[in-house]
Amino acid sequence: MASSAASPSLSLLSFTSKPPYPSGSQRLFASFRTDGLFAPLTLKSRRGRGIVVKVDDVDADGGGADEYDMDDEEVEEVDNKKDYDVEYDPLAAAIAAAGGGGDGDIAFVQSKSFISTQGWDSDMVVDYRINEDEFHKLSLMDCDFFIRKPPDPDNDVYDFREMYVTPPDTDIYSIPRVLAPMPQKYIRCAMSDYGCYNVTEPPIDAPRDPLYKSEREISKVFLTKHYRNRRTNDPEFVLDLEEIYVIDSKTKSITRARVLVTVPGGRKRDRKDDLLVIRDNGTSFKIIHVGERDDPTTVIEREEWTKTREDMEKHLRKLRDFSVSNWF
């Protein structure tokens, strides 16, 4: 008889905002590439008021300033603000590309099959097929996720305005559930995945089979934005750990992670010392200083101690009868 057991990976992941090592492979954050500029865009203000960004207790904790003004360059970094409509000018983009902008420019390409994914909260099957070569294909355990791929030498530019989801290895395309506002412009992202290894033992009546079979089951994919859209070969390249998009295999949805920032300094801090800690099965995100990193043994011991205390308290709770003994 065959038996199966899932060996989940550690519930804590951490990585710095720098790429762990320079490599051209496509695995995890080793594929961090690129630094580029957005296509020319126009910002239209709906309300004539100044922009002041405040960091509340939920988003940040530390000795940094709680309020600061944004300069013109940082305004371009603000995505999906309700006060603005972002419009692309294809003609201006073509002129900028022809003007010798270099490899850093991301050429704007109008999709003929474009369909907006903003505002959908449930799947909607479309009646056409897409050219999968024009999309980033993210293969998860329960589905395949497609995000439009603008042409770029580094192959890490994402257009979140057009996305599709299908059952694994099928061509039944539907619009995924979008649970948070998505960027309305091209951005560069580094991809990583979160999952576990499923280890299967062979049946007794098949002794010649391998002793076990291990399969990687990806439950979530994380897309982390490159800070200021810089390429990985840029000397100032870092990851913007505050902007992470999470694709969930089970719900076939995409959302933006809520990240807790404990590093002081606000948006103008030195991000090269940021360390992202992911816990609770890929649902909890926190940015700490790289100097506060714990070694894996300490983390495991702390988690086991917490779980042991909870299990013991649950057991002792069954033996207590305060509601009865208080009568005596």
UniProtKB/Swiss-Prot annotation:
List the ranges annotated as motif Nuclear localization signal: 267-275
Q: Where is the transit peptide?
A: 1-59
State the span of motif (RNA binding domain): 301-319
Role noted for this protein: Essential protein involved in plastid gene expression and in chloroplast biogenesis. Links photomorphogenesis and chloroplast biogenesis through its dual localization; required for the formation of late photobodies in the nucleus, as well as for phytochrome B-mediated signaling cascade and subsequent reshaping of the plastid-encoded RNA polymerase (PEP) activity. Binds RNA via specific recognition motifs of viral origin. Recruited by MTERF5 to the transcriptionally paused region of psbEFLJ. Promotes leaf greening.
Keyword list (alphabetical) reads:
Chloroplast, Nucleus, Plastid, RNA-binding, Thylakoid, Transcription, Transcription regulation, Transit peptide
The cellular location(s) given in this protein's UniProt record come to:
Plastid, Chloroplast; Plastid, Chloroplast thylakoid; Nucleus; Nucleus, Nucleoplasm
Q: InterPro entries, alphabetically?
A: PTAC6
Q: In which tissues is it expressed?
A: Mostly expressed in rosette leaves, stems and flowers, and, to a lower extent, in roots and cauline leaves.
Known partners and oligomeric status: Subunit of the plastid-encoded RNA polymerase (PEP) complex. Component of a large nuclear subcomplex that may include other PEP subunits (e.g. PTAC12/HMR/PAP5, PTAC14/PAP7 and PTAC7/PAP12). Binds directly to PTAC12/HMR/PAP5 in the nucleus. Interacts with MTERF5.
Q: Which PANTHER family match?
A: EXPRESSED PROTEIN (PTHR35994), PLASTID TRANSCRIPTIONALLY ACTIVE PROTEIN 6, CHLOROPLASTIC (PTHR35994:SF1)
Q: What happens when the gene is disrupted?
A: Lethal without exogenous carbon sources. Reduced expression of plastid-encoded genes with plastid-encoded multimeric promoters (PEP). Strongly reduced presence of both plastid- and nuclear-encoded soluble polypeptides and polypeptides associated with the thylakoid membrane in chloroplasts. Albino plants unable to produce primary leaves white cotyledons that fails to accumulate chlorophyll (Chl) even in low light, thus leading to high nonphotochemical quenching (NPQ).
Q: What is this protein called?
A: PLASTID TRANSCRIPTIONALLY ACTIVE protein 6, chloroplastic
Q: Which GO terms describe its cellular component?
A: chloroplast; chloroplast nucleoid; chloroplast thylakoid; cytoplasm; nucleoplasm; nucleus; plastid-encoded plastid RNA polymerase complex
| Single biological process term from Gene Ontology | response to light stimulus
Q: Where is this region: Disordered?
A: 1-21
Reply yes or no: does the keyword Chloroplast apply: yes
Q: Which residues fall in a compositionally biased region of kind Low complexity?
A: 1-14
For this UniProt entry, what is the primary localization, expressed as one broad class? Answer: plastid
Top-rank lineage group of the source organism: Eukaryota
Q: Name one GO molecular function term.
A: RNA binding
Signals that turn on the gene: Induced by cytokinin (e.g. trans-zeatin). Probably regulated by HY5 in response to light.
